[in-house]
Amino acid sequence: MKYYCDNERHLVCIPYSIENLHKMAEDLGIKRCWFHNKKGKEHYDIPKKRLKEIQSKCEVVDGREILKIIKQNSPG
């Protein structure tokens, strides 16, 4: 899996799926309470105090790219 985040603390992965989002969060040590389950916009937020740490493990892209990943791969 490849992880992507932006400077607004949004976090997704490819291949994109709810199951993979949860696996990614577990791998990065992010609690499930940071998951946003709004249909068609599912993603994790990065806890502010861990932003730099998590960014070092991801490809940092702009917010439009995060939305593109979600939109192209979301079942809803």
Please describe what each predicted stretch is.
Residues M1-G76:
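Catalytic phosphate/metal-binding cores of nucleic-acid and nucleotide-processing enzymes, i.e., regions
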